[in-house]
């Protein structure tokens, strides 16, 4: 092998994705529609419109979250009341009221800290906003990446009517379902599967009590 060919091989190895597969597609923030902006596909916009107008409560939703990398399952729950929310994911608790925003542990094993420490749930693959706004972000990204027409449908999830859309994307089919009140009912993409298991249009006031 000539010295020039060997050098070219080294360069190609260091930039493997560029030499073998071409430049990877990248969606910049500028190309993804902002929150509240329709994407122009009626099937997708029907779901986005509800996610963007999620209820302020009262509402309580319970979920099961499958993180596909590692195949681990964790519980999650959302309690909403106007001006307040309590979100639990695995052993992390995110509490927000009119006067505070803190992160605690569900079992009390660690103390509370000011603000939302999303690193506590980084291994789960979702954030405290998973129940609406973060799912809307995912859907807008998938809307840009879809490789075929989106399919609209309806479903009944946890005994609640849901509006759904299935999107063919490069790694399979992404599924999004939302309740009429804007809470996510199902999200199934390449990273996670979030499944609503119970819903109630009431909330326990103790959900918003700060731990002693």
Indicate residue ranges for each PLM-predicted region:
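N-terminal leader/targeting segments and the immediate start of mature chains
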Residues: 2-84, 206, 210-212
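Short, hydrophobic/aromatic-rich segments at coil-to-beta transitions
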Residues: 56-64, 81-88, 157-166, 181-186
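A short, amphipathic edge element
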Residues: 137-151
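An acidic-aromatic
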Residues: 73-133, 192-197
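Secretory pathway export signals and precursors
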Residues: 8, 15, 100, 108-109, ...
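Short, exposed beta-strand/loop patches in secreted or surface proteins that constitute
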Residues: 53, 75-81, 93-95, 147-156, ...
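Gly/Pro-enriched, hydrophobic low-complexity segments
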Residues: 153-211
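Sequence contexts marking disulfide-bonded cysteines in secreted/extracellular proteins
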Residues: 18-20, 103-105, 111-113, 163-165, ...
